[in-house]
Each structure stands twice: as C-alpha cells, then as structure tokens.
Amino acid sequence: MNEFKHDLAVAYRIYPKVSSHPPPVFADDKLKLARLCLNSFKASLGNLRVKMWVLLDDCPPIYEELFSRLWAPDDLVWMRYPGVKDAATFREQVRILMEQTDAEMVYLAEDDYFYLPDQFPLAVNFLKHNPDAHFVSPYDHPDIYTTELHKLPRETRVAEGKNWNSCFSTTHTFLTRRDTLRECNWVFLAPYGRVSPDLAKWMALTKRRVFNPIAFARWSVTCRFWAGSIFLAWYYCWRQILFGKKYTLWVPHPSIANHMVAGMEAPGIDWQKEFDQRPPKV
C-alpha cells in the first residue's frame, strides 16, 4: 500500500520582481510573467495529485490569488518571507521537501519556468522507472549542446517519446525523490555566503569536471565562472567530491519546460508559439 497521499510535493518560490536576466515575454511585468508560468505548470501536471508549498518572498496579496485560483485550499501551504531573496528561499524549499510526508517525489520550482501541457508526468515516470536516476530537470539546457564545459560523453535513454540525456548541471529547479534530497541535503544547505552557486553544487553531486586541473587552469583565463564553480565545489563540498555518492542528473529532449531567459530557450520547440497559445489568464 502506498504510504503517500500525493504523487508530487512541490515547493514553488516566487518573487515579485523580474530577474536581471530578462525573459522573452513580459520583461516589464512580473505579475503577467508569473501568471503565464504558473498556469502552464498547472496544465503540465496532468492528473498528478500535488501538494504545493508556496514560498512568497515579499509578494503582495495578488500573488496568492494566482495559486488559490488553481489549487484547492487543502492542497496549498502558504509560506511568507520578508524579501530574503533566492539563497534563503532555496534552503527553505529543501527543508520543507525533506520534512514533508505527503509525497515521495519532490519538485523545487522557481517562478520563471514555462511548461508544456500534460508533460510533467513524464518526468515523474522517468524517475519511478529508473532507480539509478537521481535528479531530473524539466529544462533541456541549450548550453549542453554548445559549450566546451558540457563536451563530455552522455548516456541517452528513450522513454515515452523523449530522449533522456545525462548531464551534470542545471539550475535550482529540479525533480528528485525525498530520500535522495535527504541523503545529500547538506550540499544544498551549506552556507555559501552571499552566493548560491548552482553549478558548483551539481559538479560536486555528479563529480563531473572536478578532477581536471588542466581544464581548471585554462578556464581560469578563458571562463572564470566555470573555474570559479570548480573552486567553490572543492571549497564547500570536498567531502562530497571525495567520499560521497555519485549522483546522476537527466534532462528530456524535446524539453518539458523552458527557463524564461531570452536567448536560452530549450532547442527544437517554437516557444513563442507556445506562449501565444497560452496567454496569461486575467
């Protein structure tokens, strides 16, 4: 008998200002962007039974209405914060999803992702049917195919019309199991100072690109962000790199979602057409 009442537990953090990386639509209206993304997320969930924690970071009341129009009151838990920003709310997401008892599958969501309808169950199913897969990003990162950093051998698995490709980094939006999150929670919860380096964390968890001093030396000149991420991975997570479990991260192609950063659209999909087909409801 399944001990869980829901198929998925979600911690969805939302902030009322547009990112410094402008989105492809509604670059001057965060409320419309948030509504578009949230409506698309709801449509993508299909028939999944979802428990939602809403992390409102300095949000006016109208942002609560975005969620209350889409989910029943019993499926919503409100968490309010006074403008604590990304790093703090991310740690809260991890804490909430580790401690909850509603679902085995957990999803940490940021407010600037757009989803395709009825697609999210595919990500949940992939994790269920692949015990050696630990994390899934719904976003098929374009830089996986274009940058030197990601020029590494990849494994591909085919499931439900998607090619699922192994990779080693994503953002702070990802799907995993509650037990996996508990295993490696300290990597996500470590005090990284004023930064919250997602690339460094994923390097430590997947153990990719952290054992190549030649590349580190070269990138110290040509791409300091990559080199800096390797340094941060070792500085904060050396125990994980040397003694921890090696985790795997997977992304779908074609993508299930798009990170709303202009110029970083997931490949192979006409995203503008998708946005136009699902305008934000008033």
Language-model regions, residue ranges each:
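Short, flexible/disordered intra-domain loops and linkers
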Residues: V18-K32, F188-G193
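Conserved catalytic core of nucleotide-sugar-dependent glycosyltransferases
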Residues: M105, F114-A190
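Short, acidic, metal-binding catalytic loop of nucleotide-sugar glycosyltransferases
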Residues: P24-R49
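C-terminal catalytic/acceptor-binding lobe
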Residues: E3-K5, R178, E183-V282
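Active-site-proximal specificity loops/subdomain of glycosyltransferases
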Residues: P60-E104
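Short loop/turn segments at strand-loop or loop-helix junctions that form parts
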Residues: L8-S19, D57-D58, P138-H141, H253-S255
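Short loop->beta transition adjacent to catalytic acidic/histidine clusters or analogous donor-positioning motifs
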Residues: L8, S44-W53, L76-V77, E104
